[in-house]
């Protein structure tokens, strides 16, 4: 069992209008492996939070629960709405999940069609769809790419388009899995600037501790399916015992 560390009295902020509340979430895979063991987490409007920990800690499993791809035991609420089978389409429109590999997210011939896919399947009028696509591409600074072929883009460009595909749904929460993986320094810097400027509540799973240090005021550490630390990033990065215990390195 991992050591639990108390790192900050500000770890679980009290606020009105919580964007995300996870309560005592448990999940085991069909082979019996226990991936989540009582995870609780709270994000408030405007929070930008890093989720770190070793491989197998449960980070990706947790993220897949936030829009109902996986369904464990416990409660997940998005903007005050409890995730249930009946409101699953609504929750999925409220949680923008961006996978580590953008090729898992981009499957249409053109950038426009990829970004328009979600709004079209919401049944929105054509004018609203076009407006959302334009706004999403502008947010990721890819307006000039709307007619480009998605599969011809670089990895960094694909990652930005993948973010646009969920921004076009106007989500309450943006969830990203390893967004900086595989990027060269220029593309990584572009991504950091983009994430910094996006005015949206954000939970980001990453092994990039320099990214954590630069971008996220708050960090949550997971290990063996549990939240073992939750606090101010500056405090966590100075806690050498914590970092060592959970296979993390100070940037």
Features from the language model and the residues they span:
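The feature captures the beta-strand-to-loop junction immediately N-terminal to the Walker
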Residues: 52-54
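Conserved ABC transporter NBD signature motif
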Residues: 74-83, 91
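Conserved ABC ATPase "signature" region
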Residues: 127-145
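Conserved ABC ATPase signature
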Residues: 149-153, 157
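H-loop/switch region of ABC-family ATPase nucleotide-binding domains
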Residues: 206-207
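A short, surface-exposed alpha-helical micro-motif characterized by mixed small hydrophobic
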Residues: 212-214
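Conserved beta-strand-loop-alpha-helix hinge in the C-terminal portion
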Residues: 226-248
């Amino acid at each position: 069992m991992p050591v639990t560390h108390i790192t900050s009295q500000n770890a679980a902020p009290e606020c009105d209008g919580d964007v995300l509340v996870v309560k005592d979430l448990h999940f085991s895979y069909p082979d019996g492996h226990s991936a989540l063991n009582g995870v609780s987490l709270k994000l408030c409007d405007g929070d930008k939070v890093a989720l770190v920990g070793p491989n197998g800690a449960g980070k990706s499993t947790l993220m897949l629960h936030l829009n109902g791809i996986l369904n464990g035991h416990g409660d997940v609420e998005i903007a005050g709405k409890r995730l249930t089978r009946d409101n699953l389409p609504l929750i999925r429109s409220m949680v923008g999940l961006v996978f580590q590999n953008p090729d898992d997210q981009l499957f249409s011939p053109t950038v426009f069609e990829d970004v328009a896919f979600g709004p079209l399947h919401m049944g929105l009028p054509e004018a609203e769809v076009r407006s959302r696509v334009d706004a999403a591409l502008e947010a990721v600074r890819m307006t000039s790419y709307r007619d480009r072929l998605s599969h011809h883009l670089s990895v960094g460009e694909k990652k930005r388009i993948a973010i646009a595909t969920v921004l076009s749904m106007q989500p309450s929460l943006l969830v990203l899995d390893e967004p900086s993986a595989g990027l060269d320094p220029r593309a990584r810097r572009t991504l950091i600037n983009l994430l910094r400027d996006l005015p949206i509540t954000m939970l980001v799973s990453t092994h990039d501790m320099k990214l954590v240090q630069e971008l996220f005021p708050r960090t949550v550490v997971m290990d063996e399916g549990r939240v073992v630390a939750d606090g101010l990033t500056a405090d966590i990065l100075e806690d050498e015992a914590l970092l060592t215990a959970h296979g993390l390195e100070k940037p």
